[in-house]
């Protein structure tokens, strides 16, 4: 039986964090931050089972591109103490297979966030090589604002 764990945090500039760095790390990808000029490359990272972006139907096509999405979010927030994204980390039942875990997270994100106008950047992580082999979990990065057709 899975043990419930959900943690919600904000990604804010005042804490020295950025949405581009968080998205690159959680998805094991490479993102160049246009605001700072920094490059975040985590493509060599292992343990990421599934990545996906869910966006409202009216969202522009570029919202499906991780680098474009999070750079647009960073550009839209101009204050030095801006909260640029919300992150949710949730434990997933080890009793489910991979496909069932993906569907569970998709359904949760669609109902709770995407249907309310937010974009959800999903990354499912496998348990680490050392430690509890039941530690399947998801990282969900969310826009803090609704996204419209014009962005």
Task: Identify what each model region corresponds to.
Residues 1-151:
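N-terminal nicking endonuclease/strand-transfer module with a His-rich metal-binding environment
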């Amino acid at each position: 039986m899975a043990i419930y764990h959900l943690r919600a945090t904000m990604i804010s500039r005042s804490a020295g964090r950025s949405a581009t760095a968080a998205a690159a790390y959680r998805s094991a990808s490479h993102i160049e931050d246009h605001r700072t000029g920094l490059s975040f490359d985590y493509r060599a990272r292992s343990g990421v089972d599934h990545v996906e972006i869910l966006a409202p139907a009216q969202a522009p096509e570029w919202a499906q591109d991780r680098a474009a999405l999070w750079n647009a979010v960073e550009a839209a927030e101009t204050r030095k103490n801006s909260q640029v994204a919300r992150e949710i980390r949730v434990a997933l039942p080890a009793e489910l297979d991979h496909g069932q875990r993906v569907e569970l997270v998709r359904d949760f994100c669609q109902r709770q966030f995407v249907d309310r106008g937010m974009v959800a950047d999903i990354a499912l992580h496998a348990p680490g090589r050392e430690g509890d082999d039941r530690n399947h979990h998801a990282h969900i990065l969310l826009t803090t604002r609704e996204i419209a057709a014009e962005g």
